[in-house]
C-alpha cells in the first residue's frame, strides 16, 4: 500500500531525497517540513521549524504519516526519532544517543580512540588557556580546532600559526560564535591527502556504502576563500579505489557500527564518513549522522534501487536482505550561491531560466533547491546562501561535469556566484590513473 511520507528539513539534500523517494511505487503522498519554494513543486510543504520537535511530531500524528525521514542534523540531535517512536511512527535516522556521533566531536573522537578506529591524533579541552598551552607545546602548524557541537558545518578552523589559533580559540570558546557548541573543543593534528565522502546505509548490524563522492568546501576557485557547507560535488571519487573501499570497510565502517553497539547506542540510518586518505592509510576526519549536502545531490541520482525500501530496511533491521545498487555512471553538482555567501548576502532576488523549478528540455539534469522561495505573485526568488544545485549524470565524469556547467549557464539571478573548477581535481586524478 502506498505510504504517506514526511521529510523533515528544507534544503537541497531534502529535495534530492524527495525526488528519489518519489520513484518508489510504494511512495504515496509526500510532504516536507519546512521545505522551501522549489521543493513545493515536488511535495506539499508545511512551515514547521525542523528543530521544533513537539510541533513536528504533533503534525505527524495528526496527519497520520506512515513514515518520517529526518534528514537534518539538529532535529536528530534533539531526539526527533525518539519522539516519533514514542508516538508510534517509524522514522529513518538515528535516535538521540546515536546522533551524538555527529553532535559531539568529543564523543566521536573518544569512541575512535577507545575502539582503535584510525583518526587524527587529538586532545579535548574545556579551558581556553589550556588549549593554547597545548598548541604551543606541540608547536606544529597548521593545527585544527573543532567546536564540540553542531555548527552548521562551519565549526572547524585550520590555523596556520599561533595568532590564528589564539583568535580561533577566542572566537569559539570565549565569544561563543557557535553558542554552547563551543564549550568544549577538540584540537587535532592536520592530516594530508585526498578527501573522500562516503555515505552509507546501516541498520545497526550491516553497512551498505553508497557511491563515494568528493566535496568542494571552499567558497572560491582553487580551493580559496572561506569554508562553506559545500559548493559542489562529484561522484564517484576517483581516489576511492576498490582496495581503499575494502580497507575502509574492515578498519572503519564495520568497527564504527560495532563500537556504537558496544556503547549501547546502535546507529540506524545514514552514517556519513568524512575520510582522508593519508600516507598511513584512510583516517576518519568526521562522522555525520545524516545525508551530506550537497553529496546527496550526486549520490541519490545514481541509485538504482528503491530508496524507500532501503530506508525502511534500515529502520526494521533487515538491510542485509535489501539490494543497494548504484549505476556505473557519474554525477556532478554545481552549487549556485548568493554573492557574499557564506558571510553576508541578500535574499529575494528573482530567478530566471526555470519552469516549475526545473530546466525545460534538459535530459539527465536535475535542479535541487537549497534556498528558494515563491512570492505571493508566483515568482521564484533566492532565499538563502546556497540557492540551487544543478546536477547532471552521464556515463563518465567529463560528460556529467560539462553538462552540469552548460545547464547552470541557463539559470540567472542577481549576484549569482559559483565555482568554475568543480571536479577538476577529480579529472586530474583520473588522468593520472591512465
Can you name each region flagged by the protein language model?
Residues 1-96:
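ATP-binding N-terminal substructure of ATP-dependent carboxylate-amine bond-forming enzymes
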Residues 46-52, 123-127, 159:
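Short acidic-hydrophobic, aromatic-tinged amphipathic segments that line or gate anion-handling sites
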Residues 92-155:
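A conserved helix-loop-beta module that forms one wall/lid of the active-site cleft
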Residues 249-271, 288-362, 375:
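Active-site "cap" helix and flanking loop/linker of ATP-utilizing ligase/carboxylase catalytic domains
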Amino acid at each position: 500500500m502506498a505510504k504517506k511520507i514526511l521529510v523533515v528539513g528544507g534544503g537541497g539534500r531534502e529535495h534530492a531525497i524527495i525526488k528519489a523517494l518519489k520513484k518508489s511505487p510504494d511512495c504515496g503522498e509526500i510532504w516536507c517540513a519546512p521545505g522551501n519554494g522549489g521543493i513545493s513543486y515536488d511535495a506539499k510543504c508545511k512551515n514547521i521549524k525542523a528543530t521544533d520537535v513537539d510541533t513536528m511530531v504533533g503534525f505527524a500524528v495528526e496527519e497520520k504519516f506512515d513514515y518520517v525521514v529526518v534528514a537534518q542534523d539538529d532535529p536528530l540531535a534533539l531526539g526527533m526519532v525518539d519522539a516519533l517512536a514514542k508516538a508510534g511512527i517509524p522514522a529513518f535516522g538515528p535516535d538521540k544517543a546515536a546522533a551524538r556521533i555527529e553532535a559531539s566531536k568529543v564523543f566521536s573522537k573518544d569512541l575512535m580512540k577507545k575502539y582503535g578506529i584510525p583518526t587524527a591524533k587529538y586532545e579535548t579541552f574545556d579551558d581556553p588557556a589550556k588549549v593554547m598551552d597545548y598548541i604551543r607545546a606541540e608547536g606544529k602548524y597548521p593545527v585544527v580546532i573543532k567546536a564540540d557541537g553542531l555548527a552548521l558545518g562551519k565549526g572547524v578552523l585550520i590555523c596556520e600559526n599561533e595568532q590564528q589559533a589564539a583568535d580561533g580559540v577566542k572566537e569559539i570558546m570565549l565569544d561563543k560564535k557557535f553558542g554552547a557548541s563551543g564549550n568544549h573543543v577538540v584540537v587535532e593534528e592536520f592530516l594530508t591527502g585526498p578527501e573522500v565522502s562516503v555515505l552509507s546505509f546501516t541498520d545497526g548490524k550491516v553497512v551498505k556504502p553508497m557511491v563515494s563522492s568528493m566535496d568542494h568546501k571552499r567558497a572560491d576557485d582553487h580551493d580559496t576563500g572561506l569554508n562553506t557547507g559545500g559548493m559542489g560535488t562529484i561522484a564517484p571519487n576517483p581516489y576511492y579505489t576498490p582496495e581503499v573501499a575494502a580497507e575502509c570497510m574492515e578498519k572503519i565502517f564495520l568497527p564504527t557500527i560495532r563500537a556504537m553497539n558496544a556503547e549501547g547506542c546502535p546507529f540506524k540510518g545514514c552514517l556519513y564518513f568524512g575520510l582522508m586518505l593519508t600516507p598511513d592509510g584512510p583516517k576518519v576526519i568526521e562522522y555525520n549522522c545524516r545525508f551530506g549536502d550537497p553529496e546527496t545531490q550526486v549520490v541519490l541520482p545514481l541509485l538504482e534501487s528503491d530508496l524507500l525500501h532501503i530506508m525502511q530496511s534500515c529502520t526494521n533491521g533487515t538491510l542485509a536482505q535489501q539490494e543497494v545498487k548504484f549505476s556505473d555512471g557519474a554525477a556532478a553538482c554545481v552549487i549556485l550561491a548568493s554573492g557574499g555567501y557564506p558571510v553576508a548576502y541578500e535574499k529575494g532576488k528573482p530567478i530566471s531560466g526555470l519552469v516549475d523549478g526545473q530546466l525545460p528540455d534538459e535530459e539527465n539534469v536535475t535542479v535541487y533547491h537549497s534556498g528558494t522561495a515563491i512570492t505571493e505573485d508566483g515568482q521564484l526568488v533566492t532565499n538563502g546562501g546556497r540557492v540551487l544545485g544543478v546536477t547532471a549524470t552521464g556515463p563518465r565524469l567529463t560528460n556529467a561535469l560539462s553538462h552540469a556547467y552548460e545547464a547552470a549557464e541557463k539559470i540567472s539571478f542577481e549576484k549569482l556566484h559559483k565555482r568554475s573548477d568543480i571536479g577538476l581535481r577529480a579529472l586530474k586524478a583520473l588522468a593520472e590513473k591512465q
